[in-house]
């Protein structure tokens, strides 16, 4: 059987080295003993095959104990477990999230973290692809407006089409009027319709 065994890194230096070689972000996870969110993450979320596939497709996973790895904890001001930090091979932070996530939400946060790594590098098409996939896969998830906002930003930065970005924001306001993202409408004409 040619089964691929996926392994999380526990050594930050080795994970950063691998990230440099593979040109992927590191997804740093802080854990600790007696963390109920960590236990549920391992028994529910990380048991799902699609979650595991996507982790190893998109990131270099690194897991460290928040109480034992003081230097790295201090660098990111980490205080909670589980928590996730998407960083480049130099250790620069691009996105973070704290708390337990069920499988679908984790897959969305993974996409938000990876796209936050890709966009500053000008890899707009890659970011757009991963965000559009998330929107297709999780049409009813309450985190969808976050995906839509990041998608609108990536498209805008790729094309500099302001009207397109306003249409994306308007769709968020129409479909998810109570979301925090819908409240980010920045234009004076409150009743704008594309």
Regions found by a protein language model. Give the residues of each.
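Short active-site neighborhood of thiol/selenol oxidoreductases, capturing the structured segment around
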Residues: 22-35
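TPR/TPR-like alpha-solenoid helical repeat scaffolds
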Residues: 144-157, 180-194
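A short beta-strand-turn-helix
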Residues: 8-25
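Alpha-helical segment of the N-proximal tetratricopeptide repeat
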Residues: 74, 110-140
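Non-catalytic, surface beta->alpha helical segment in thiol-disulfide oxidoreductase systems
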Residues: 78-114, 118
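Single-residue signature of alpha-solenoid repeat helices
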Residues: 127, 164-165
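Short solvent-exposed coil/turn linkers within tandem alpha-helical repeat scaffolds
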Residues: 49, 96-100, 134-145, 172-186
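Thiol-based oxidoreductase modules, predominantly thioredoxin-like and allied folds used
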Residues: 4-10, 30-32, 45-70
């Amino acid at each position: 059987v040619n089964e691929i065994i996926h392994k999380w890194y526990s050594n930050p230096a080795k994970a950063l080295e691998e990230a440099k070689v593979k040109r992927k972000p590191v997804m740093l996870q802080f854990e600790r003993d007696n963390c109920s969110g960590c236990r549920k993450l391992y028994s529910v979320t990380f048991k799902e095959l699609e979650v595991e596939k996507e982790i190893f497709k998109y990131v270099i996973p690194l897991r460290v104990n928040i109480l034992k790895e003081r230097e790295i904890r201090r660098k990111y001001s980490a205080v909670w477990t589980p928590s996730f930090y998407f960083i480049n091979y130099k250790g620069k932070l691009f996105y973070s999230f704290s708390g337990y996530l069920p499988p679908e939400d984790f897959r969305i946060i993974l996409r938000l973290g990876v796209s936050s790594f890709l966009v500053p590098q000008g890899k707009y098409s890659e970011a757009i692809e991963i965000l559009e996939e998330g929107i297709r896969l999780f049409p009813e998830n309450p985190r969808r407006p976050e995906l839509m906002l990041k998608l609108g930003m990536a498209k805008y930065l790729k094309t500099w089409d302001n009207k397109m970005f306003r249409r994306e924001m308007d769709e968020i306001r129409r479909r998810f009027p109570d979301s925090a993202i819908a409240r980010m409408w920045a234009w004076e004409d409150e009743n704008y319709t594309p």
